[in-house]
């Protein structure tokens, strides 16, 4: 049966439901979700109007979907695609990828999640080269978790949705991940979208803060993210940039996440979702302490395992996580043409 390709800007509810069916079928077959969190949020809530979709139909059945993001003028367009397992091995992946390349003028950065051999074969056979690897690392939560101490004067508490914490976190996150645009470009709207997700739990979103006037720094540096604005300090420590509205200044954070049964095809698993630390605090062990606080929280929730994502090139972070008991589990690969 002949396949046909249709291009879309926004998908309607029926099309979104069909795409989610394809995604879940692929997740069940492969043991890894084929689309990253950003694309899934775009599907559910909409996103940048410049992003688009390519749908591949075989007869009346949706056989494949591609998300195309043309918003990076420097690195060029990026994309992710998925083929329903029932339609694999029939040339539909190549057909869909060629349609995406036609849309982007032949230039594309393509993510393949889980290092799937079929995705690698397709990418290499169509002239792509591998440019980036993102490790997934895991650790048992049954193993001992080291104790930790916070630096002098630092207080640890949890995030309060709908409060000045939101803008303070966005500010620190942007500086923390200034060289990681996927994470550092998050806006207040991006944060609020995640607050609406079923997995969001402020009890697992830890903030480290100092009273205003304590310490020197007002610039942030980054930690680790999932599948990464202006100053993080505030002159008065109130609800200004970096201030949390209670006379304190945000200097670090650890946002944890719990994936349910459907997310990874197995029992629920925790995630070190995002960690960020003010560079004025570096060398004092704050990042390590924040990480361990999150691990202790996830274990207290009864979880058996925790995962995180880290760029293969970030050897310092990999060494830190290895010292905390994490080992490599899987890899996501980016290809470019």
Curated annotation (Swiss-Prot):
Reactions performed catalytically: 1D-myo-inositol 2-(L-cysteinylamino)-2-deoxy-alpha-D-glucopyranoside + acetyl-CoA = mycothiol + CoA + H(+)
Domain N-acetyltransferase stretches: 11-151, 154-337
GO MF assignments: mycothiol synthase activity
Ranges for region Disordered: 210-246
Pfam families, sorted: Acetyltransf_1
Family of the protein in this entry: Belongs to the acetyltransferase family. MshD subfamily.
Protein name: Mycothiol acetyltransferase
Species in which this protein is naturally found: Streptosporangium roseum (strain ATCC 12428 / DSM 43021 / JCM 3005 / KCTC 9067 / NCIMB 10171 / NRRL 2505 / NI 9100)
Lineage of the organism: Bacteria, Bacillati, Actinomycetota, Actinomycetes, Streptosporangiales
This protein's encoding gene: mshD
């Amino acid at each position: 049966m002949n396949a046909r390709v249709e291009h879309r800007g926004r998908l309607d509810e029926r099309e979104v439901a069909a795409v989610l069916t394809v995604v879940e079928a692929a997740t069940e077959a492969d043991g890894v979700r084929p689309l990253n969190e950003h694309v899934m949020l775009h599907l559910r809530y909409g996103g940048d109007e410049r992003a688009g979709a390519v749908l591949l139909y075989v007869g009346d059945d949706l056989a494949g979907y591609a998300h195309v993001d043309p918003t990076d003028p420097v690195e060029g367009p990026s994309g992710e695609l998925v083929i329903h397992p029932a339609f694999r091995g029939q040339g539909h992946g190549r057909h869909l990828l060629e349609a995406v390349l036609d849309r982007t003028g032949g230039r594309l950065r393509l993510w393949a999640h889980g290092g799937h051999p079929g995705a690698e074969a397709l990418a290499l056979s169509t002239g792509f080269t591998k440019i980036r690897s993102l490790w997934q690392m895991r650790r048992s939560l049954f193993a001992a978790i080291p104790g930790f101490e916070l630096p002098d004067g630092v207080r640890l508490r949890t995030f309060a949705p709908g409060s000045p914490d939101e803008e303070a976190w966005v500010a620190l996150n942007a500086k923390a991940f200034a060289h990681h645009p996927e994470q550092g470009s998050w806006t207040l709207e991006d944060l609020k979208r995640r607050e609406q997700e079923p997995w969001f739990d402020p009890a697992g979103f830890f903030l480290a803060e100092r009273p205003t006037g304590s310490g020197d720094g007002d610039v942030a540096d980054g930690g680790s993210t999932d599948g990464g604005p202006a100053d993080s300090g505030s002159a008065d420590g109130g609800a200004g940039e970096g201030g949390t509205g209670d006379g304190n200044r945000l200097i670090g954070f650890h946002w944890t996440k719990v994936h349910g049964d459907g997310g990874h095809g197995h029992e629920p698993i925790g995630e070190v979702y995002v960690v960020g630390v003010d560079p004025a605090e570096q060398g004092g062990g704050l990042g390590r302490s924040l990480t361990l606080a999150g691990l202790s929280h996830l274990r207290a929730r009864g979880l058996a395992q925790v995962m995180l994502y880290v760029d293969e090139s970030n050897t310092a972070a990999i060494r830190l996580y290895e010292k905390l008991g994490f080992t490599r589990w899987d890899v996501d690969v980016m290809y470019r043409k």
